[in-house]
Amino acid sequence: MELLDINKTLDLVKLKFYNEWLYTAHIYDEGPSDLHEKLTKEVVKTYVDPLNLRKDSVILDMGCGPGYFLDEMKERDYTNCIGVGLSPGDNKTARSKGHVVKEYDMSFIPQQDGWHDESVDFIFLRHALEHSPYPIFTLMEYNRLLKQFGKMYIEVPAPDCDRQFEFVANHYSILGEKQLAALLDRTGFKVDVFNTIEFDATITAPDQENTQVKEKYFCLVVTKQRPLDIK
């Protein structure tokens, strides 16, 4: 099959412009969240601890926020955990606690900084994939980074919920169960665990009364089953 000429089919200047617009318009600090700190503790206990990762495993926390996952892993004596994020305030908070945080686009981790193919043991991707405008590229990049049979934890908001995650300013990919499973299969991952969690939450907004809503998340553990033949 003859390959398409990318110089004719893709406007790289426009792609760069669109990305810069997203960065300047829609990146903001998560800030402290008692709910997400509590949920992260439960996630690590339920999904990460049973993996029995080596203490020197290379671990990436994509979209690390203020560093709640990094806190948990530090308490467990993991020695090689790196956060990735673009929110200046959250990065500053995480670094103030002694964590290493890199300012990378989570879909494109630079090889020139030493992030070679199959160099990572585990990726933590909690409430980050929905922020990717191109989730299939994001998952392709994580396939590149992960060692063969490396693991990844994914947690994403479910579509069509009371909370209307689709309308959050920096949410671009609120994936349903089938679409998420299909993307993982196409990018070389095997789903080991696919759970749905639901709970009641109180939403607080400035100058508005508190609102009770149903939250619904998908929680997955996946394994890199095969590398992608895209070179």
Model feature map: region roles:
Residues 58, 149-151:
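Short glycine-centered segments of the SAM/dcSAM-binding site in methyltransferase folds
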Residues 172-187:
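Short alpha-helix
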